[in-house]
Amino acid sequence: MEKNWYVVHTYSGYENKVKANLEKRVESMGMQDKIFRVVVPEEEETDIKNGKKKVVKKKVFPGYVLVEIVMTDDSWYVVRNTPGVTGFVGSAGSGSKPTPLLPGEAETILKRMGMDERKTDIDFELKETVKVIDGPFANFTGSIEEIDYDKSKVKVFVNMFGRETPVELEFTQIDKL
């Protein structure tokens, strides 16, 4: 059985409570091998009130929570019977199993929240020569001059038109030679 992302419908305004309840239930019922992550999709927004800027988190999908599950009868039961959960999105009728999100859909949502699904192993070093594999500089080679672990980016000096040109790239856009 493989793990997939599913969308769970909740009472609006109860998303964080459902997340907390579900995480407690997973732990108390020993379901960590079936239910992996519970995510309330949020993004930061800047509101201006009385001339003051304030950064607030807004729900991207009010009334919905994403859950990464290996779908079995037990895992379905645990999620479905969590207080505040009204059901799975994509299940037609009682007892039917829900439809998972497509892999790209979950990844897009997580990326939008800064929780990229695919974390790359970072074993690049300064001054290392790498090949650019994606983007407008694909197939160029260059030397790593800076590594920003927080942003998952590197600055690579690429030789273009006889000069070293600094290019900022994501870890996923480069490969070791």
From Swiss-Prot:
Biological process (GO), any one: transcription elongation-coupled chromatin remodeling
Disulfide bond annotation, renumbered to this chain: none
Keywords for the protein's UniProt record, in alphabetical order: Transcription, Transcription antitermination, Transcription regulation, Transcription termination
Domain of life: Bacteria
Pfam family, one: NusG
UniProt domain KOW: residue ranges: 128-156
GO CC term (a single one): cytosol
Gene3D superfamilies, per the entry: 2.30.30.30, NusG, N-terminal domain
Function, in words: Participates in transcription elongation, termination and antitermination. Stimulates RNA polymerase pausing at U107 and U144 in the trp leader. NusG-stimulated pausing is sequence specific. Does not affect trp leader termination.
HAMAP family: NusG (MF_00948)
PANTHER family the record matches: RHO-INTERACTING TRANSCRIPTION TERMINATION FACTOR NUSG, TRANSCRIPTION TERMINATION_ANTITERMINATION PROTEIN NUSG
Family in the record: Belongs to the NusG family.
Name the UniProt record assigns to this protein: Transcription termination/antitermination protein NusG
